[in-house]
Amino acid sequence: MKLPRDLSGAEFARALTKVGYRVTRQTGSHMRLTTSDGGEHHVTIPAHESLRVGTLAGILGDVAEHLGLTRDELARRLFD
């Protein structure tokens, strides 16, 4: 699945709530999201207007690995 090109950090954080993540803190221009599904896991997302595709792909890969999904499966759950 092709990744969205104009996704903001806040929109991405909202999408990650669909798979059990929640914002635990925000410091400056970064948000930290945490889930306890399958063990505690943290990801840090820049709160920028538009996330770079490589940044988005890296975070998706990290989350997908933790959840035991492929990156494409996770992208479909979040963006479809």
Where are these regions (language model features)?
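C-terminal structural segments of small proteins and small subunits
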Residues: 50-80
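Glycine-rich, flexible loop/turn motifs
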Residues: 3, 41, 74
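Short, flexible active-site loop motifs that bind/organize anionic cofactors or intermediates
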Residues: 2, 46, 64
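N-terminal first-folded block
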Residues: 1-27
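A short, structured beta-strand/loop element
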Residues: 23-57
